[in-house]
């Protein structure tokens, strides 16, 4: 899974570079999680998980606090999750996950992006069956065998544990991500660089320079949309 890990890192690094976009999108996600439950991370596990991910992305405390305070203050916006799937050139596939207060606006924007950027939007499920919903946990370390034993003892459903460039990279069944994190914390591991649910392509394609330019434009436009939280694809050389 080394290539998959490299793609996740590349995507995360690219998105982290656009700091204002990252902060705004985490602000929305934190607000939505706080509104759906208690605005206290100690009693709202979904909110706690989002805050942990925001800290991994170096979102400042004041951005996190502002989103929680907005939820506490009775903000009346309601956000709905969505997923849009489609195709780029030569077997390329893309999934955009959204969080929006205006579904009609989001649908219109996503359709426009696909139409203008050389893609074709598909029906629900058109490409997601070619991706595996996977828990990904990353932290500094060099002994994957020891980590695998910890997870095995905790009965975590693990797909793979590898060492990549001084990092332990764990892939779990999506339903066992939080169980895996808890097992690692119980073993004394508390600093994580990534704890995410990722849609990982079962197989990847490589695009020609011309097709890659088109596909990159599609992915960039989707990621730039304010309502899009995450974008997944199956292109190995992007």
Curated annotation (Swiss-Prot):
Location in or out of the cell: Cytoplasm
Cytoplasm in keyword set: yes
Keyword Cytoplasm listed: yes
UniProt record, GO biological process: regulation of DNA-templated transcription
Coiled coil: none
Keywords of this entry: Cytoplasm, DNA-binding, Transcription, Transcription regulation
A GO CC term assigned to this protein in UniProt: cytosol
Record-linked Pfam families: TACO1_YebC_N, Transcrip_reg
Gene Ontology MF annotations: DNA binding
Family matches, as HAMAP family: Transcrip_reg_TACO1, Transcrip_reg_TACO1_YeeN
Family statement drawn from the similarity comment of this UniProt entry: Belongs to the TACO1 family. YeeN subfamily.
Protein name as annotated: Probable transcriptional regulatory protein YeeN
Species assigned in the record: Salmonella choleraesuis (strain SC-B67)
Native organism taxonomy: Bacteria, Pseudomonadati, Pseudomonadota, Gammaproteobacteria, Enterobacterales
Protein encoded by which gene: yeeN
